[in-house]
UniProtKB/Swiss-Prot annotation:
GO annotations of cellular component type: cytoplasm
Location of the Clu domain: 420-662
Annotated function: mRNA-binding protein involved in proper cytoplasmic distribution of mitochondria.
UniProt keyword annotation of Repeat present: yes
Subcellular location per the Swiss-Prot or TrEMBL entry: Cytoplasm
Biased composition (Basic and acidic residues): 719-731, 752-762
Bias (Basic residues): 58-67, 959-975
BP term (GO), one: mitochondrion organization
Signal peptide from the UniProt entry: none
Lineage per the UniProt record: Eukaryota, Metazoa, Ecdysozoa, Arthropoda, Hexapoda
Protein name listed in UniProt: Protein clueless
Amino acid sequence: MALEMDSKNSNSAVTGDAAAATTKTNKAKENNNLAGSKKNQSQNLVNGNGTAADGPATKKKGKKNRNKSPPVSTDEAALSNGHVEEKKPEGDGDADADANANVVAVKDEKAEGGDEADAAELDTEDIDLDALHDAGIHVNISCPGSELLTVQLSSMELVQEIHQLLMDREESCHRTCFSLQLDNVTLDNFAELKTIEQLESGSTIKVVEEPYTMREARIHVRHVRDLLKNLDPADAYNGIECTSLTYLNTITQGDLLDKKKTRPDSVDCTPPDYVTPGVFEPPLLPLHPNFKNAKGPQALKVLTTSAWNPPPGPRKLHGDLMYLYVITMEEKRYHISACSRGFFINQSTDDTFNPKPDNPSYLSHSLIDLLSHISPSFRRAFQAIQKRRTLRHAFERVATPYQVYQWAAPNLEHTVDAIRAEDAFSSKLGYEEHIPGQTRDWNEELQTTRELPRKTLPERLLRERAIFKVHGDFVTAATRGAMAVIDGNVLAINPGEDSKMQMFIWNNIFFSLGFDVRDHYKELGGDYAAYVAPRYDLHGVRVYNAVDVEGLYTLGTVVIDYRGYRVTAQSIIPGILEREQEQSVVYGSIDFGKTVLSHPKYLELLRQAGKHLKILPHSVYNERDEPVELCSSVECKGIIGNDGRHYILDLLRTFPPDVNFLKLQEVKLSTELVEMGFPIEHRHKLCCLRQELLEAFVEDRYVNFIRIAAVHLQQLNAKKPEETQSEEKKQLPAIEEAEKENKENLNVNETPNEKEKDTPVETKNAEAMVNAIREAQSNVATSNEIQAAEVVKQACAAVGSMKEKEFDFRFNPDVFSPGIRHVDGEEGTSGSVAKQKLLVQDAAEFLVVKQIPAFVKEHLSHSSPPIDGQNLTESLHSHGINVRYLGKVIKTLGQMPRMDYLYRIAVMELIVRATKHIYYTYMQSTDPMHLSVAISHFLNCLLTNGPINPVVSNDEMHKKRGGNGGKHNKHKSSKGGKGQQQPAINQNGGSTTSSSSSANAYDWTLVTPRSLWQQIRKESKAYWDWDLDCDSMDSAMNKFGIMRICLLRAFCLKVGIQVLLREYNFDSKHKPTFGDDDIVNVFPVVKHISPRASDAYNFYTTGQAKIQQGLFKEGYELISEALNLLNNVFGAMHQENGSCLRMLARLSYLLGDAQDALAIQQRAVIMSERVNGIDNPSTILEYTHLSLYSFANGHVGMSLKLLYRARYLLVLTCGEDHPEVALIDSNISLILHALGEYELSLRFIEHALKLNLKYFGNKAMHVAVSYHLMARTQSCMGDFRSALNNEKETYSIYKSQLGEKHEKTRDSAECLRLLTQQAVLLQRKMNDIYSNGKLTSDLPPIHITPPSMGSVLEMLNTINGILFVQISQRDIVKVRSEIEKRMKANTDVNEAIKSMVAAANNNGESEVLAPQDNNKEQAATAQQLTNGDKVAVSS
């Protein structure tokens, strides 16, 4: 019943409201889509029931935390969120971090009495959500044949959501064609409940059955089919309908909240063989547990449309709409008529058409009722299906926002399904052929939603929800269209041209292929450049969408990789197809700078966006030698559509070029870079720097700017001017020297201890800087404006600012573009091309010199280690490091034994990417008839040692060599390779030209393991400048410790292959590992923008700041609000919702509510499995969190099962040699120890100790804990000597790290004393046996006390980084005041510098362009302090 409580606005609400806010046509579209789309119905189902299902229902929000709008961050802060669309809310890396993050839970001695000062502080924050929170109303719903149903609804909900609620309930789910009436008045589906005057609490809404139309009858049949196959996982394996898998309830055998606490002696805790330490290649079958029993009972043998359709004219006049054909489980065959009043059996047979009702006739408004009447088997099976359906968690039934594909799938039975067949061959999506205008106008929908008002919080929620809904539909349609294009099912709009130049329009979406059409990219790398251009263009669309300048429009863009092809799908600008491009473009250039146009409106709009994106306005000469001003790259085109909107497209050069990968005569790189092998000539000249790098670079320069300005301000305040001048002469070289040191001081081998020693000094410097600025500020403001201006000028010069008297860092993206003539400004000014080039060079150097070492240094602590290549790529991108630097990163990691796991993951990622390039080349030239054989052959060459013999008959080969192999081969035969992998690579490893590679559709048969490995080696050297120094894949596996199953998983996910779920023997010498039957499917790899929920993000980050200050309850309330807002925007199922749930579960646990933590974390696990994937790294971490909360709730056996699942998935993903495996093994060992399984426990803890020694060193706290756990286990086994030795190691580490007086050291000393006593006692007994041959009775017995569950939980908390400490109220106040003091110091520095600069620049007319807002800086400061406290307490 929880689903019926606390309703929130759903996605249907969005589209309904958006429609109402725009046009009636849109409203009609959404109405039709909602009715016909299973995805929308499912989303509305849980969404409409809101936070009771997904939000923490047990915690109520305090009224003091309410306001009219969420915490607002500045434009810069908003941008910093917008640039990484795939990034989750910051909780993944901050206060929540991961299982290793040490969190200090403060138990306040005053139980519930919060600090009044804190309450006052929160009251001053402008946080109120009265606009979203209402008391709700209780409404009675009367359904025909059912009892009166009472539900609580939000007044903001739409009537449509009551429809979805009823369609999900067991007793009313079979109804689809009905209206809702109040006092005999039919309610409008898109009306908000609060707008209905007669509706009040206690009102009764009546469900009235409506007559069917053709459309409604089809919708009803589709809904019945969905109900019957609700438990069938086939759609999830096939990757359709936005369905996906979850196995949590299979692992736990039901809802964890319904489980009773288990006694330790009743737990079956034996781990499966594949989970115990030492397994080399984990099996594949456990990845999908119990898949054979997932389908559920079969209710019908066949339900399909009849061949007698459509009804002839006379029968239409009798009300017939369509005919169905059914075979029941009793083998009876029925022909069914659908008429306006419902469904009935007619007298037709397979051979005879007789549409009259059968005798006796039975008419039912619901097809389910009719089938239950004629088939007892159907009635029983349907009841069983419904019972199982309602037992499933709500999150298991909701559609995901985007399709998640499985890389392994079982053999699925292919059943008769008319609706599936109809969907496969219909040209539209679902029921869209019935909406006005036939097809959706994607561009109009995308742009209209962006134009919705955004001034108030409800308006912003409606707008963001509408954007998200339309974008999700567009991605689904674009993906389906791209697959249809590559499969040859769409006619080109220019069919007479060469196949690689063909373009397509399907469902109002424009599709183009990743080839260099008309030599457009000839000077930039040809097809290589054409292949990567869509990806860079997508980056540009993403950042301009994030900036969200009103009046500036981008195209809906999706990039799809499928079967070796890259397809770009874009919405269509109104009118662009009616005229030539030369006539359309009013801004930018269509020929890379030969002709350049500008437009005042575009300059105005792009100048606004450029402030956030750090793009420098610049001027270039056009073909008539006239200067033309631009506020973007030359390639960026501005087109005014027929709708009057200003569109920008071709945003591939939004950010400046990466000179480290361009060989340019005018660029002289530093000696350090040259020694590292730069510049490297890349395959294309479109390499650009990432936005994250530019932000980090500007932030670094800003810190230096403040430091230098502070030093000069101190000089201004000196008592004697003469001394000041002489000091200035001394200080200036010192500052420059400090700058030099600052560049070089980032040593990746710096130890944590060294880092801690530096902290107090930095704090003192910061305080001195603040004091100096404060003292100087008054002088600057009154009489020292000239001197202040000089200070700013010197600081700007020292950091290389683009402006002489203002901190300004913006980049010219065209500065190194060939063929563009720049208007050169005065030397030293922002218009100086030389200065612009130097800045871009400095940013590229910053990446290599600072960011790569910073990346490595960050992972030295192993606090949140990457688990697979996807994790690694995300981490690199967050530091602004492009994947083309992977070779350089690998070289750095290879010199560090403590980074061995990351080195292995990076090498595997490089091998997978190199293999992808080669694989795509062969797939393009493969005949469609032989795709499965070709793919299995390629996998055999990549992964196995057995004989490789592709099965293709010689006759067929010779016959096909002469022809083009049909429609598909027409694409492939002329295209050859594309993009990064465009030219095929011949057997000797050399590249051939595009034409020669495409000549043969059977090139794949010539691939051998040896030739493939040689190509991979050449690719790794050519693309990443890294020597893969192994002579075969086998030697590489052994050298780097890579498992074949891990490589198979990574490669399948990377290129979109689905293999059969079975065990593969990679070492077979007699037959190939893969056969053509092992290739189940090929799925698309889709790249798109993820719309964001800005208000939810602001609440989330504010909540994080509270948590970092120790204000857990306030943080919980803010993050709960963030989750509510996310539910409003994204619906119940989204990655960011999962991050919020994980954080809330952790906070509940820290606040002492383990049961609430378990309930919330269970939802987080299901959500992660559904939206990320069942073996995604995030899912693995969610499982480990859930196991801890399960143990805390007394579910000991479940806790072990969850840990076994997490360990299996982790080993399948990256192998056993990983710091995260050490954490899981420590948890497993401790729980097994508590259950008395000492031998098993010892195996796991020995493995954990081995890994901890390797990755943390022999003096680390992790190692001390592992030694202590081993000692405890061995003492329980009676092996006191070994226990004593291990506890001595623990004592030694504690003593050296913490000192003799520390509590942990004293505890270890006491443990040593007890072990020594037991060891002496045991020795006495042994001596007695040896001397007397029997035991004497006077020796006391050896007593081994098993640990209590409380002590085990305490130790589990310690291992997982959670430490509960008792702190007095005075200490809490002291810590908070210290945090506030540091925050204030940071704020004062910024404010003082800004004021001083403003005074120096014409009495405050200019301002410093700081790289980030104060909120972010404060959060960083709080995080820094919290981290320091963590170390101290966890020690």
